[in-house]
Curated annotation (Swiss-Prot):
Provenance organism: Homo sapiens (Human)
Gene3D superfamilies: DNA helicase RuvA subunit, C-terminal domain, Phosphatidylinositol 3-kinase Catalytic Subunit, Chain A, domain 1, XPC-binding domain
Superkingdom of the source species: Eukaryota
Name of the protein in question: UV excision repair protein RAD23 homolog A
Keyword annotations: DNA damage, DNA repair, Host-virus interaction, Isopeptide bond, Nucleus, Phosphoprotein, Proteasome, Repeat, Ubl conjugation
Length: 363
């Protein structure tokens, strides 16, 4: 007797597939590919998750006792890396707006990074390792050629009410709330990366999560190889990046807004970060050498990647000053108000909502 399998993606898309109980998980993946398309859902890149476990290809569907009232989560990892070189990403032809400041081109060292096609021989387990592979879950890396790349960079990082929704969705996969919260925190609220952490192990967790044997073996590989190829290495000595890292470690929810601001003021750098998101997150997780004042990040996001350290002060119009004063009247420290105001692109209402949604500790 045929059964109906309900499947849901991390983008909240739901669809159904009819299966015979004796058909294997591999057959289910093939049916998903046939219905949703080989480019979006290749069999080799699919991971099916039910009750917190990855379904094995050669196991019949009946063995997992999937309740038709529940759903199976579909994740897709990038396995066909050659697609990145065969055709440009779909994008709007309009380029991202440039800031009035002249930005230097991204360092050529970033372009010497091995092309994706050179890594086609790697196994899917290597591509899903959270700390050693530059590949990431499909959809988690913003499109580098999009006119709205700063919005793309922030769109995969959820905050506010979306955070609670995504938290509930991931918990529905069979994970406890505490583990999901820890995974989201480690991934800076990136739901795709959080699920990867739940499957392969949360960085800094005392006990590794139970992923596949291959994934655990890959995670043990030394990170020196990836570090040696890091095209964002030049950021380490940038005082603006060091301040940004300190602020984000204190308040991870600021990352989407800061990335969006960076995309407006330095789109070339955001494009490079988008191509190497894994290394960028690793650098943000590194402990800072010196504790920076949280106010030091004000106005400096756009200066990251430049050689102009003179951007230490910002000028505000009388209207902007009045908005800052009104936000201060809500009871928040001036440094936090300024930080939130500029991180939210001088949107007073958005900044107020952000400040009220955070639990800042006055220093």
């Amino acid at each position: 007797m045929a059964v109906t399998i309900t499947l849901k993606t991390l983008q909240q898309q739901t669809f159904k597939i009819r299966m015979e109980p004796d058909e294997t998980v591999k057959v289910l993946k093939e049916k998903i590919e046939a219905e949703k398309g080989r480019d979006a859902f290749p069999v080799a890149g699919q991971k099916l998750i039910y009750a917190g476990k990855i379904l094995s290809d050669d196991v019949p569907i009946r063995d997992y006792r999937i309740d038709e009232k529940n759903f199976v989560v579909v994740m897709v990892t990038k396995t066909k890396a050659g697609q990145g070189t065969s055709a440009p990403p779909e994008a709007s032809p309009t380029a991202a707006p440039e800031s009035s400041t002249s930005f230097p081109p991204a360092p050529t060292s970033g372009m010497s990074h091995p092309p994706p096609a050179a890594r086609e021989d790697k196994s899917p387990s290597e591509e899903s390792a959270p700390t050693t592979s530059p590949e990431s879950v499909s959809g988690s890396v913003p499109s580098s050629g999009s006119s709205g790349r700063e919005e793309d960079a922030a769109s995969t990082l959820v905050t506010g009410s979306e955070y609670e929704t995504m938290l509930t969705e991931i918990m529905s996969m069979g994970y406890e709330r505490e583990r999901v919260v820890a995974a989201l925190r480690a991934s800076y609220n990136n739901p795709h990366r959080a699920v990867e952490y739940l499957l392969t192990g949360i960085p800094g967790s005392p006990e590794p999560e139970h992923g596949s044997v291959q994934e655990s073996q890959v995670s043990e590989q030394p990170a020196t190889e990836a570090a040696g190829e890091n095209p964002l290495e030049f950021l380490r000595d940038q005082p603006q990046f060091q301040n940004m890292r300190q602020v984000i470690q204190q308040n991870p929810a600021l990352l989407p807004a800061l990335l969006q601001q960076l995309g407006q003021e330095n789109p070339q750098l955001l494009q490079q970060i988008s191509r190497h998101q894994e290394q960028f997150i690793q650098m943000l997780n590194e402990p800072p050498g010196e504790l920076a004042d949280i106010s030091d990040v004000e106005g400096e996001v756009g200066a990251i990647g430049e050689e102009a350290p003179q951007m230490n002060y910002i000028q505000v119009t009388p209207q902007e000053k009045e908005a800052i004063e009104r936000l201060k009247a809500l009871g928040f420290p001036e440094s936090l108000v300024i930080q939130a105001y500029f991180a939210c692109e001088k949107n007073e209402n958005l900044a107020a909502n952000f400040l009220l949604s955070q639990n800042f500790d006055d220093e």
